[in-house]
From Swiss-Prot:
Source organism superkingdom: Eukaryota
Protein known as: U13-ctenitoxin-Pn1b
Family indicated by similarity: Belongs to the neurotoxin 17 (21C2) family.
Protein's UniProt keywords contain Secreted: yes
A GO CC term assigned to this protein in UniProt: extracellular region
Amino acid sequence: VFCRFNGQQCTSDGQCCYGKCRTAFMGKICM
């Protein structure tokens, strides 16, 4: 499995390298 960096869109399970998956105006991104 790979994780998403901050500023990238979250995967369906919301796995982020750092921070958390949050809903933004452009969809769900890692912050």
